[in-house]
Amino acid sequence: MTLLSRVLGLVRDVVIAHLIGAGAAADVFLFANRIPNFLRRLFAEGAFSQAFVPVLAEYQQSGDMNKTREFIGKVSGTLGGLVSIVTILAMVGSPHVAALFGMGWFTDWMNDGPDAHKFEQASLLLKITFPYLWFVTFVAFSGAVLNTIGKFGVMSFSPVLLNIAMIATALFLAPQMDNPDLALAIGIFLGGLLQFLFQIPFMKQAGLLVKPKWAWRDEGVTKIRKLMIPALFGVSVSQINLLLDTVIASFLMTGSISWLYYSDRLLEFPLGLFGIAISTVILPTLARHHVNREGDSAKSAVDFRNTMDWGVRMIFLLGVPAAIGIAVLAQPMLLTLFMRGNFMLNDVYAASYSLRAFNAGLLSFMLIKILANGYYARQDTKTPVKIGIIAMVSNMGFNLLAIPFSYVGLAIASAMSATLNAYLLYRGLAKADVYHFSRKSAVFFVKVLLAAIAMGAAVWYYVPEINQWAKMDFFMRVYWLVWLIVLAAIVYGATLILLGVRKHHLLTKN
């Protein structure tokens, strides 16, 4: 399901690139899309799940189903009330949101500059896209509940509906409107609604669809609140950094936001397919091991450490070849996927520079998802917050140092900040004797790196020059790209086998 969602996400971006390219309209829509997208990552893949799942695991561990159902109702009611207020305020105050995150456009609007129209259009689009916050909050809530009972497929499939809605509005509604970016914003709203409605039958089938109830002072809700407030910052530092990049990009040349977006989206494919998916799967297991520590603390600690180590090994296995593959195939991938309609060859070149810069931090972005779980499963949110503050402040400093590199400098700064974040998260776990990078995993990493280098060399040898790619028709580009990816997989897999990697190296309790 996750693979289907990511593939459709790429199809959606291909359609968007064809429709609005990388010009002013694209910058405005992608700006308006980034806010709910940030909130999706924050809630669906971030702070809420990190705070809610461990507490829910405690209620489920008690074996009292009625108490668990009552807890779910109180959380949904309290969360729903708060998010409703925030959503309404954001819709009414959308010009203020646009001014905050699009300061460059707002400055032009105040001074009748050339980008004044971007600020006005962004304010309008935010009114349409912000209700997505309300929908995605409940999607994240129900998805977290279903994940704890082993129904991972429901949450994995939900983003498919968002992608379908956006593709449909781009193909059928946009041609009927003067502003195609407005149709895309409507697609975000409809996608959120479909995701929300899709979850309801599964919650009912599981016997967990209960009446929401406001319970701000409830013991369980209070515990989640205390865990979530710092986690909101700690788990989403990379996303906050991207928002800060958006603010700075609004001062740069037209196209900067679009080039950064398309770069980020290509990077999101392996990050979402591997990093977030693995993180989502291991969090309930880690939380369970932590809860079970009262029965057999020594065994629980070992199980916790083994689960963490397995997650890190999987990130190495999938993330290292993904990073090297993207570095070699950055321009061919961008050209094959996006160069049509309003997306030109110069956009391919521009986006490839920021893609390679972002890609330098891919492994760190993925490791953050795993390492952060080592804290949140133990209900420790303070440490990631401290680390997050350091990483975010560092990102601001890196941005200043990278000013000469324009929008590419923003991507470089994000990669450097993510690497620092991942290192500090690991160091904290090691100091607390929660998780140490095992010797077997170190040997495994070396083998993975050697295999990935061999893979990258083989692909680099056979890949055609970019001018040759530009002259190919679409189907020939796809043929070459698929062939190179298959070649990469064969070389990578064969080299791993030659280096002695076997199935038992991939098991949790290796």
Curated annotation (Swiss-Prot):
Keyword Chaperone: no
Topological category with respect to the lipid bilayer: Multi-pass membrane protein
Compartment(s) where it occurs, according to its Swiss-Prot or TrEMBL record: Cell inner membrane
An individual GO BP term: regulation of cell shape
Cellular component terms per the entry's GO annotation: plasma membrane
Swiss-Prot/TrEMBL keywords: Cell inner membrane, Cell membrane, Cell shape, Cell wall biogenesis/degradation, Membrane, Peptidoglycan synthesis, Transmembrane, Transmembrane helix, Transport
Parts of the chain that traverse the membrane: 13-33, 81-101, 130-150, 154-174, 182-202, 240-260, 266-286, 315-335, 357-377, 396-416, 443-463, 481-501
InterPro entries registered for this protein in UniProt: Lipid_II_flippase_MurJ/MviN, MurJ
Pathway: Cell wall biogenesis; peptidoglycan biosynthesis
Keyword Transmembrane helix: yes
Organism domain of life: Bacteria
Principal localisation: membrane
GO terms for MF: lipid-linked peptidoglycan transporter activity
UniProt xrefs under Pfam families: MurJ
Family as reported in the entry's similarity comment: Belongs to the MurJ/MviN family.
Function according to Swiss-Prot or TrEMBL: Involved in peptidoglycan biosynthesis. Transports lipid-linked peptidoglycan precursors from the inner to the outer leaflet of the cytoplasmic membrane.
Name listed for the protein in its UniProt record: Probable lipid II flippase MurJ
Organism: Haemophilus influenzae (strain ATCC 51907 / DSM 11121 / KW20 / Rd)
